[in-house]
């Protein structure tokens, strides 16, 4: 039902193999997302993302459709409010998509941004509870991906070994990578959000704007460099390096979304390994969709 149209891949670029480029497809039906993922793949993007709603279009069905139509481009969520999930459900969805795509999935997680479309369906348990749930969900996610027998006992979730209908493992080992929001609070000696991000495979960096309750991002290249240094120290304490670890900066080289802007090379020099275009300034309209497609066809801002 889709006809592939070659757009001409953008090659090379001065940032080399270390810097990769993604885009959030902001407003699109499942079919439109799949078509735009094809456009992005042909134009040289490295990954496309969808957002995950509390109620609405299912992110994993959407990514599954894109997985069947594409061959190379990675597929991810930005973001999955993982604390809302039962961890075995999340592990099932991500592993299924990883097998379907041939190992092209990234799970992006955070505590979730509270808004009317969330609170219309469930009360907020509080940031501290969501944080503890997020940690447990990720622990169980990783454990189940490793196969059976697996057992876990936590404050909110538990799991016992099973022997029947055990699914095959994901393609990516030990599991599809997890990228976590990592919020650095300059006034705090302990950085719990960064500690979480350091335990996994990548970080969406953010700088708190005064308090945890108002974490408006104040990310700058110098702040990113400090955050990456802190992550490096945390990983070193656990016997890990930054080799293969992803630092993902969101920005908008076309419009006005957020406070993070190019030049992209400054972010690469500060430690970023991914630049992700987030075009939330575009309207949810035929004109907005046409502009999103045009931006994807231009390819990533490699030069």
State each model region's role.
Residues 8-303:
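Active-site-adjacent structural elements that line small-molecule/cofactor binding pockets in enzymes
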